[in-house]
UniProtKB/Swiss-Prot annotation:
All residue ranges annotated as the S5 DRBM domain in the record: 11-74
Gene: rpsE
This protein's name: Small ribosomal subunit protein uS5
GO BP annotations, alphabetical order: translation
Subunit structure: Part of the 30S ribosomal subunit. Contacts proteins S4 and S8.
Keywords in alphabetical order: Ribonucleoprotein, Ribosomal protein, RNA-binding, rRNA-binding
Lineage of the species this protein comes from: Bacteria, Pseudomonadati, Pseudomonadota, Alphaproteobacteria, Rickettsiales
PROSITE patterns in UniProt: RIBOSOMAL_S5, S5_DSRBD
Length: 172
């Protein structure tokens, strides 16, 4: 009897990037593939992974496993946007994530869009500045998502009640 992990079949997978890698050796060239994948449950959990192998399918599998290992929980406001604006950096890549009103949609490019889709965010505005390298963008986006905090967690850190901390208008 095999064990089935919960949420195993509910994870959404997005293949963000596939590259062919060439290693030049004495006898010629050796080809391999690298893949970058984002996985999420569309309910506030997301992860990204990178895998390398001789075949594309193997690289995808390794990337998927790495993404599952690195999954993280992100606090969402009304299960559709983020609680506050945040900036993330990774190397020369910088991303700005801004909360948005209902009906705005996901305004983001490339790999950021894949992350938000897998995360379950429906309304967000994201701007990338600097490097457009896929791996740097994903890393910067995860840096920004790590900085997010719900008003409840901020209040707990400050030993206060939620209504005592300064909270922006939540009519967004």
């Amino acid at each position: 009897m095999s064990k089935v992990k919960k949420n195993e079949e509910t994870l959404s997978e997005v293949l963000v990037d596939v590259n062919r890698i060439t290693k030049v050796v004495k006898g010629g060239r050796r080809f391999a593939f690298s893949a970058c994948m984002v996985v999420g449950d569309k309910a506030g959990r997301v992860g990204a992974g990178h895998g390398k192998a001789k075949e594309v399918n193997e690289a995808r599998g390794k990337a998927k496993q790495a993404a599952k290992k690195r999954m993280m929980k992100v606090p969402l406001y009304q299960n559709r946007t983020i609680h506050h604006d945040v900036i993330g950096k990774s190397g020369a890549a910088k991303v700005i994530l801004r909360r948005a009103k209902a009906g705005t949609g996901v305004i983001a490019g490339g790999s950021m869009r894949a992350i938000f889709h897998s995360l379950g965010v429906h309304d967000i505005v994201a701007k990338s500045i600097g490097s457009t390298n896929v791996y740097a963008m994903i890393s910067a986006t995860f840096d920004a998502l790590n900085k997010l905090a719900s008003p409840k967690s901020i209040a707990m850190r400050r030993d206060k009640r939620v209504n005592e901390i300064s909270v922006k208008s939540y009519d967004v």
